[in-house]
Amino acid sequence: DRDYEDGLRYFQDKYPGTMAARIEFDPALSQRMYAAADMFLMPSKFEPCGLSQIIAMRYGTLPIVRETGGLKDTVIPYNEFTGEGTGFSFSNFNGDEMGDAVFRAARLFWDNRDAWNQLVTQAMSQDFSWTRSADKYLDLYFFMHPEIERPAAVVDEPVVCLLYTSDAA
């Protein structure tokens, strides 16, 4: 949305050295930005999966996301009463809610650095690996097929399966 882009550029010009906005994508710059930033704003209107918020969390950059698709599935909103969470979120696609989420994140950053650091640790410790995904898949599979007993041992070494299909009849 052009209005948001212009707004971000305005604040970049108003606060040089403190705030920066890059609308284009540059892979080399993106890694440096993830590593240097404290917060990562991802206000997607639609996002089937989203990797950027996962990358941000791995770097210790807390995501601020709109609750849609994979963003809602991967970012746990910060709960100031329990300390749980991995980032910040907002529900509706509008500037007021987005601004409120950014304000909540900034307030925590400036007013409670211990809670902020704990939230960063929680975000960085999230497991989005294939091992976790495969284990969830197996849980579902064995739940749907109770007649099949799930093996107790888990293999820590990689397993390679080769499937061969032949066109020959």
Predicted regions located by residue number:
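Catalytic binding pocket for nucleotide-activated donors in carbohydrate/polymer assembly enzymes
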Residues: R32-Q118
